[in-house]
């Protein structure tokens, strides 16, 4: 018999037998105000932008917070890229060497609409920047709970399409990060 009994699933209205009370949900953990921004691009400087599900006019690069304070930024970048695009750039993969730590951070005010996700009093986030070079024909598989569409744009157009100023600034740095010392 499958877990959850003959119905194949748990009874959502289940109560504890002795008290008659419904189980108390686990408290929701607050987001850690340390995140990554990963600019995914081709060698031709075409940039992948993804459209947020919770803010339909917001186009962005891959972003996401650390799940645990001890997580490294690279570990967070690999996880977020895989979760949001289906692209695996973990150690030992063909794209693993393409994930470059730009060794830059942005500190910015968290948008008021998202502050409820953080502990009381947290208003600023530190964002660590990465670039990921990929082949132009790489398949993209979005997580529909987070993003609803994607598009590839030339780097300047991608920067202009971003809702986040820090994301736009990161994309505008892309030519310098790919070819240090050369003007864009």
PLM regions: where:
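NUDIX/MutT-family hydrolases
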Residues: 127-172
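Conserved Nudix-box catalytic region and its N-terminal flanking loop in Nudix hydrolases
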Residues: 42-90, 96-97
């Amino acid at each position: 018999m499958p877990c959850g009994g003959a119905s194949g699933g748990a009874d959502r209205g289940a109560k504890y037998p002795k008290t008659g009370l419904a189980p108390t949900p686990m408290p929701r953990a607050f987001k850690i105000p340390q995140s990554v921004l990963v600019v995914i691009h081709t060698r031709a400087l075409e940039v992948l932008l993804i459209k947020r599900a919770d803010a339909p006019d917001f186009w962005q690069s891959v972003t996401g917070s650390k799940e645990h304070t001890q997580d490294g930024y690279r570990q967070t970048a690999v996880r977020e890229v895989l979760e949001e695009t289906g692209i695996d750039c973990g150690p030992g993969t063909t794209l693993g060497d393409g994930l470059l730590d730009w060794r830059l951070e942005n500190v910015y005010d968290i948008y008021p609409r998202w502050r409820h996700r953080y502990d009381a009093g947290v208003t600023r986030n530190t964002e660590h920047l990465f670039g990921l070079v990929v082949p132009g024909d790489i398949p993209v598989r979005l997580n529909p709970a987070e993003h609803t569409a994607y598009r590839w744009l030339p780097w300047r157009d991608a920067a202009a399409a971003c809702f986040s100023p820090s994301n736009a600034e990161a994309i505008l740095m892309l030519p310098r990060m790919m070819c240090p010392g050369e003007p864009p």
